[in-house]
Design a protein with these regions (language model features):
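Helical "lid/coupling" subdomains associated with nucleotide-phosphate turnover
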Residues: 1-56, 71-227
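Active-site-adjacent helix-turn-beta-strand microarchitecture at beta-sheet edges
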Residues: 65-66
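Short beta-strand-loop elements within alpha/beta enzyme cores
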Residues: 59
Length: 227
């Protein structure tokens, strides 16, 4: 119903919305992640990551149905987007497909991570340039939630730019994956709407860090609207 939706929006707003392509969305996501912040919306906010990072950067957005990868390069406070890919790997998709027990059984978790790794391998075989990234930046709800669980609270100022080591991410994954949903609901950093899907989302992030050799990940609250 995309066409009818756009027509209706146009009638209400008096202007026709522009639908961005997948590549353009990836570029905007990358630029927003590295140049946006929480202090100001728009490019190169005072707390943006572009001011403190150098070299090839991979931005990862783990969504409900897919995971988006965006690669770029930072140098001298300037960001350049270079490539993108979409993986049919997502927190809701994988929860519904693999994690049927509460808490998930070990074999369910193994299947979830194995398929995530195989899907990532397919992309890396076609686009090996993603393997050049030396910094991992994660964005959006899944990434922010994992950080909030580690902090024990949700605070945008603490989350933006938060570095978590691979060991810390693995520890959060082990904790969440072995708790029943009722216990996860009492975690002060975990929003109620993410209780059922965060295990798969965290497992996808763990898989990316393991497979691509990232020692840590940075959280960015920058988004498409900051690009």
């Amino acid at each position: 119903n995309g066409g009818s939706l756009l027509a209706r929006v146009g009638e209400v707003l008096g202007t026709v919305p522009r639908v961005v392509s997948g590549d353009e969305e990836a570029r905007l996501s990358f630029m927003g992640a590295v140049t946006g912040g929480i202090e100001t919306f728009g490019p190169a906010g005072a707390d943006s990551l572009v001011a403190s990072l150098e070299g090839p950067v991979l931005v990862v957005d783990i969504g409900g149905g897919s995971t988006e990868l965006a690669l770029g390069h930072l140098a001298g406070g300037t960001a350049t987007f270079t490539a993108s890919a979409s993986l049919q790997v997502g927190s809701v998709r994988f929860t519904e497909r693999y994690l049927h027990s509460d808490p998930p059984r070990p074999e369910e978790l193994s299947d979830c991570l194995s398929v995530a790794e195989a899907t990532l391998d397919e992309v890396l075989s076609v686009q090996p340039s993603f393997g050049s990234a030396t910094t991992l930046v994660v964005v959006a709800g899944t990434a922010e939630t994992i950080g909030a669980v580690e902090l024990g609270r949700w605070d945008d100022r603490e989350l933006h730019g938060l570095a978590m080591s691979k060991a810390q991410v693995e520890d959060v994954f082990r904790t969440l994956a072995t708790e029943p949903a009722d216990d996860r609901r009492h975690n002060p950093g975990l929003p109620p709407e993410r209780v059922d899907y965060i295990v798969a989302g965290c497992g996808i992030l763990v898989t990316i860090m393991r497979r691509m050799g990232f020692a840590e990940r940075l959280v960015s609250l920058g988004s498409v609207r900051d690009a």
